[in-house]
Amino acid sequence: MSDKYKYRVEIQQMMFVSGENNEPPVETTSLIEDIVRGQVVEILLQATRTANCRGSKSIVPEDVIFLIRHDKAKVNRLRTYLSWKDLRKNAKDQDAQQAAAGGGAGDGSGPGGIDDDDAGKKDKDGAGVNMKVKKSSIKLPWELQFMFNEQPLENPDEDDMDDDEREANMATLKRLKMADDRTRGMTKEEYVHWSDCRQASFTFRKSKRFKDWSGISQLIDSKPHDDVIDILGFLTFEIVCAITETALKIKTRYERIRSMKTQSQPQEYSVGTTRRKKRLFDGPDNVVNPLKPEHIEEAWRVLQTVNMKHRALSNYKGGRLSSRTVIM
């Protein structure tokens, strides 16, 4: 089992960020890891079919993003994640180039008569412009603007948001509000642990382990793009968070139903107190209840439910809706 399940620690950290304060049992993390692996395999298979439809054997980032295009908030979060990744990469490259140029420049006054301060200022301004352009350069080919031959000019000062960006910002603000509520009463050590858990990833500095774990070499013919691996790392984090948040809601509902049944049981009355009559095999009163496999299985069933908007199409297909794994 230790060879099959390799991400127990990372899944525990992601579950902690999503609201699970108790340490989940091995069965729970193993089930989540199996679900995540199945989702990764399904993403790769569907992305391969999408790439084949456009006459290519290699998967590009747009093939993966196309599979989640209906979740506007997630797509915008992913685009922001990729743009900041490119921004950091370009900043490192520019720093390396500036360091190499500075090492061979000698003193401040060169043959062109330009001081180091002026040159540094120009380099800084140029780097800022390049990074700003690079950050906003991610475009998706199925967007409305690609249906026209001529594209509108981009205005860097224009800061208008469309409905998709507003939806993504609202979802991001809700997540930040939940994170703020959870971390408000934390000590410094607890917040450091929280920050470390937020950096948990299936792929960051674990690319080889992730490829062996998911079996990418058996699923696709060509070598995957680096951005594809990063996107899969982003989506695996989102999948674990979605499963955990849904499972916590299901656990709360189960506990509410159990408490209602408990209240309907006969009570033992004494002077000044009212308590439920204890049975022979009743457990302790204050027991820690982490997420169990049944909570994860029910959360998986809920998340795999087909939306009514898409289910209505079965009326025109003889009433039978073909079952297919939903990518979370």
From Swiss-Prot:
GO biological process: transcription by RNA polymerase II
SUPFAM superfamilies the record matches: Histone-fold (SSF47113)
Stretches the record annotates as Disordered: 93-128
Free-text function comment from the UniProt entry: SPT factors 3, 7 and 8 are required for the initiation of Ty transcription from the delta promoter. SPT3 regulates Ty1 as well as the mating factor genes. Interacts directly with TATA-binding protein. It is likely to be required for normal TBP function at a subset of RNA polymerase II-dependent promoters.
Main localization, broad class: nucleus
Molecular function, one GO term: protein heterodimerization activity
Protein name as annotated: Protein SPT3
One GO cellular component term: SAGA complex
Composition bias type Gly residues, residue spans: 101-113
Sequence similarity: Belongs to the SPT3 family.
Keywords: Activator, DNA-binding, Nucleus, Transcription, Transcription regulation
PANTHER family: TRANSCRIPTION INITIATION FACTOR TFIID/SUPT3-RELATED (PTHR11380), TRANSCRIPTION INITIATION PROTEIN SPT3 HOMOLOG (PTHR11380:SF16)
Pfam families (alphabetical): TFIID-18kDa (PF02269)
Compartmental location: Nucleus
